Amino acid sequence: GNPLFFWTLDALQWSNVDRIIVAVDLPYVDYINQYKFSKLDVYVRDPKNSRDESATEDVLIELIDSWNLDDDILLAQATSPLTRTKDYNKGIKMYSDYDSIVSVVRQKRFIWNDEGYPSNYNLFNRPRRQDFKGYLVENGAFYIGHSEHIKKWNNRVYGKIGLCEMDENSYLELDSEEDF
């Protein structure tokens, strides 16, 4: 089978993005390049931003500075393999109306707090799940913004934020062994 990152790159390859940049550690350059995606460029990240505790924003800003990027950036996460080309294209289309975009899913779950009280519904007027509007949750699949503002705010989202709603099954994120 294909590695986890393949599914994200494949969906991006067929999307409306002009260029795909993958930030990797040096030992993985040849491994990534063997997949021959025509839009693909590989960026070798600084070892200080290759640690498990490194923030995504640190890698983004490092890339922006190193390559002098002045462009719109779609940050896609390889840990969200169920993101489809149409999801990326939907976010790209929405972007013209917003400063930044975050992908989300609608959850229709009833949430309780640590004290034993419901957080998102009235205990004595519980809606049917089918009638429950639910709430939107980041699924971590992708974010869109401009390099200048990402750097200025040191954040992947800022300003007027658009929420790109995706199918509920895209909530899956594979960040740790427990997620498998």
PLM features per residue range, with description:
Residues 27-74, 82-90:
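Short phosphate-binding loop-to-helix
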Residues 56-62, 69, 81-168:
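Conserved core of the sugar-phosphate nucleotidyltransferase
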Residues 18-20, 72, 99-100:
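Residues at the starts of beta-strands that form the adenosine-phosphate
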Residues 165, 169-180:
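Hydrophobic helical membrane-anchoring modules
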Residues 24-25, 77, 104-105:
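Short beta-strand/turn micro-motifs composed of small residues
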Residues 1-23:
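N-terminal glycine-rich phosphate-binding loop and ensuing alpha1 helix
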